[in-house]
Curated annotation (Swiss-Prot):
This is Serine hydroxymethyltransferase. The modification N6-(pyridoxal phosphate)lysine is found at K225. It is an enzyme of class 2 (transferase). Its EC number is 2.1.2.1. Homodimer. The lineage of its organism: Bacteria, Bacillati, Bacillota, Bacilli, Lactobacillales.
Amino acid sequence: MEYAGKDAQLWAAIGREEQRQEGTIELIASENIVSKEVAAAQGSVLTNKYAEGYPGKRYYGGCQFIDQVEQLAIDHAKELFGAAYANVQPHSGSQANMAVYQALLKPGDTILGMGMDAGGHLTHGSKVNFSGKLYHTYGYELSPETEELDYDAILAQAKEIQPQLIVAGASAYSQIIDWDKFRQIADEVGAYLMVDMAHIAGLVATGYHPNPVPVADVVTTTTHKTLRGPRGGMILSKSEELGKKLNSAVFPGTQGGPLEHVIAGKAQAFYEDLQPAFKDYIGQVVKNAAAMAEVFNESETIRVVTGGTANHLLVLDLTKTGLTGKDAQALLDSVMITTNKEAIPNDQRSPFVTSGLRVGTPAITSRGFKEDDAKQVASLIIKALDNADDQTILAEVKEAVHALTQAHPVD
């Protein structure tokens, strides 16, 4: 598209990024490809409008149509997850989490969340994050034997530290999470239960993972990842009464004017998520991840953490390859496969290096990849990592990647 007075360097960079996305197999589990309708809504004239407040209660005039847009997003979100309350204004998942902490806690209170090397997120209590600076935070780990959540150990830890808030949910955990067991743990120690379902929200919406909304006090999520919406955040609850505190924590507590053009993109994405085709899509995401796990499990050098996956992602232990996660990520980048380095349970390397990779199937599934394609991608990863110094083989992998991306263009 041509624009008068455009910044040529900017648009050249955007064009190169478009080419990169077209020519790359995208396996970062938190990335996806939005529809043209979502992109159009986000690029609409709503970006011009300031709208501090909430529908029907704004601090600016001229918000009558903005109110309609935001209310649609709220209504679609509530229907999608069976929630009594939804706030679609958080700019990100991190800001959604921050707002919940502000609503439920006071500085110095104690949070028990998933440890980073167990698959948790920065905002679940990392000492370099606001969550670890404003609150006393502790991380629960995985069972050394199964590499899955050990609910008895989490209960024992909760009894010991007596947290005011327990955070369930992960950014790199491949198995089903038992929300009811977390509810029992929280009730036993008198804590609030917050679920961060950012990664699995699309699976929850379609029944491929149990729904935490009826169980938890508060649920947060991003709106991209498996929901295929714009980058943003959202807060859900079964309690309208608690929703009043949450609204105040978002605005004016942690944010000013909402990004209504992004909220329009959220509304469009949620509308798409309510259609039958979205359930088919998520089903294929899960099948593709399982197909990749099957291939990786046959490798002599790559180990799948937990032995498999029940959702959209896998964590790969690269110890036997002799490569760090950082090295493997760079190597795969060179053959046009995009992944991210990831800590494995009890990883001794720093988060900037790691001993593993995280791979996910949302983006390739949006491009129409099926199980056989996913298996081929896994085989190409193994081939590349097992032959890291062989430029001839790496060139073969890159050529095969090119063929796959040509066969499955970004719509």
